[in-house]
UniProtKB/Swiss-Prot annotation:
Cofactor: Mg(2+)
Source organism per UniProt: Dechloromonas aromatica (strain RCB)
Biological role stated in the UniProt entry: Catalyzes the transfer of a dimethylallyl group onto the adenine at position 37 in tRNAs that read codons beginning with uridine, leading to the formation of N6-(dimethylallyl)adenosine (i(6)A).
Molecular-function annotations in GO: ATP binding; tRNA dimethylallyltransferase activity
Pfam families xref list: IPPT
Protein name: tRNA dimethylallyltransferase
Protein residues bound to substrate: 16-21
Sorted UniProt keywords: ATP-binding, Magnesium, Nucleotide-binding, Transferase, tRNA processing
Residues the record marks as site: Interaction with substrate tRNA: 105, 127
Amino acid sequence: MNPPRLPPAILIMGPTASGKTAVAMALADRFPVELISVDSAQVFIDMDVGTAKPDRATLDRYPHRLIDLITPEESYSAARFRADALTAMAEITAAGKVPVLVGGTMMYYRALLHGLADLPQADAELRAEIDAEAAAEGWPAMHAKLALVDPATAARLHPTDSQRLQRALEICRLTGRPMSELLAESEKQKPPYDLLQIGLLPSDRAVLHQRIARRFDEMLLAGLDEEVRQLRQKYELNLNLPSMRCVGYRQTWEMQEGLIPKREWRDRGVFATRQLAKRQITWLTNSFAAENYDCLDPALVERIAARTEAFLSS
């Protein structure tokens, strides 16, 4: 006798500007699903323009869980995401619907699918020391330091990925052990669901880059500059906070402070977004057992809808 099927859940993963939200909303029009955001920037209240957060009318029609959870002064971890996502998935399943998780924060997907190592809590004093070192020596030098003590983690991090470099160095210094070793020891903790993992990847990177540039231009027209000014007036913020490290926000802050010329602001924001997309594609290609679809395919929605129907009826 076959064991009963686990409840279904769908993951829609992909780089920025790949059309994930449009696919998720199309599924919500056709199937009894509820959406869960997997986006480390959209958890922040009042950060709407630069995160491409769905507008109020869209959210009224297609509610997303795990949006607008904390202020930009706060931090939100992968561990908290996993707990919140599993709670939301259980509630959606209990209501007779199918959870659809949609977003591009690959670290959150990894935490959900594989669990998390027992890593130490953040140490504000140590983080300040690491930031001071980085200010004096530069993040590429910090990357070189990490490579000496944790070559495996250093190999997968970009030399300017300050947030992850800071965390990896912090863990090494707090525990005396490399983060990669601690992660390897973590027991795989698969969520209790029958998962359909859908990946959206571009067949032509140049077209994705055009989408990224167009969307960043739309953010500028929608008032990204003013949004950052209002955030800085309302909250106690600095460039080391996760909220202000988000792509677009960092470049806007630096422009406002005169750290970069205003004429370079747009191009730097587009470049940073392209680098983010590159990292997301690398994660998706190397770390997940997803069924990949060309996000530039005009028939994308129909193909994924057909696959979803087959998955839910199997």
